[in-house]
Amino acid sequence: MLSTLRRTLFALLACASFIVHAAAPDEITTAWPVNVGPLNPHLYTPNQMFAQSMVYEPLVKYQADGSVIPWLAKSWTHSEDGKTWTFTLRDDVKFSNGEPFDAEAAAENFRAVLDNRQRHAWLELANQIVDVKALSKTELQITLKSAYYPFLQELALPRPFRFIAPSQFKNHETMNGIKAPIGTGPWILQESKLNQYDVFVRNENYWGEKPAIKKITFNVIPDPTTRAVAFETGDIDLLYGNEGLLPLDTFARFSQNPAYHTQLSQPIETVMLALNTAKAPTNELAVREA
């Protein structure tokens, strides 16, 4: 713990990737209610989404304005009917263990996800993909059942279409676990102790801009009041989270203390009301329009 650190408190309105700016020290300690999990990029709870995003990356990435930009894929094209997409991958990316990230590795990850398609049935893209193959080391082709408007947007989601080194599959699959969380992202899970802490270190071989911080420790503190006390006593440097993880009254109290720097994000999610058109009464158009 660096005693000179001016502790920072973040209260976010929705879950987001953990970001540290260049002004931060080399090491920082924060807290989370649970361990980050085994960090299988293709599964859900107990894998913590923010931590999956620290280790694993997508072909394309969301921006704050909702646009989608190239990431592990540097460009793409699609057929006139919108069903066949060809991605040109970056040729300078390796997994944190040194394995190359190429079209074969990407295709293997898609296969692993789709072999467990029923688990991802909530995401329509998992139902739309009919074929994924490597055309060359840097060319990946994805074929869909039909033109699917939110294709790129769903590829950009934090899970399940992210990439782990194929050597870390178990029995050529990921649905029943992985050997180790080896991704292409800027962070490496160095150590994890159940109900105690998780330690991430910077991926020194990361292809992109490296984080300014070299090490992040997440202490496991389930109770929000205890987390707040740990922050006040200096046991942790930063609090981060949304309502429930960090009560807004606690945030309001800390924001009045000049010793702390507080920040409240803009909303980063869209809330919608979905109507079940297969069952009464919302199966009636007149009811839905009312």
PLM feature spans:
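Gly/Pro-rich hinge or "lid" segments in bacterial periplasmic/extracellular proteins
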Residues: 67, 158-211, 215, 225
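Extracellular/periplasmic solute-recognition and catalytic clefts
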Residues: 190-201, 217-279, 283
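Aromatic- and charge-enriched surface segment that lines or borders ligand/interaction sites
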Residues: 75-119, 141, 227-230, 281-284
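N-terminal lobe/hinge region of extracytoplasmic solute-binding protein
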Residues: 31-80, 108-111, 118, 182-183
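A structural "hinge/loop" feature
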Residues: 34-50, 72-73, 99, 151-160, ...
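Short, well-ordered beta-strand elements
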Residues: 25-37, 74, 84-87, 106-110, ...
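Surface-exposed binding/hinge segments that line
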Residues: 23, 88, 123-168
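Alpha-helical secondary-structure segments
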Residues: 102-109, 139-143, 185-186, 213-215, ...
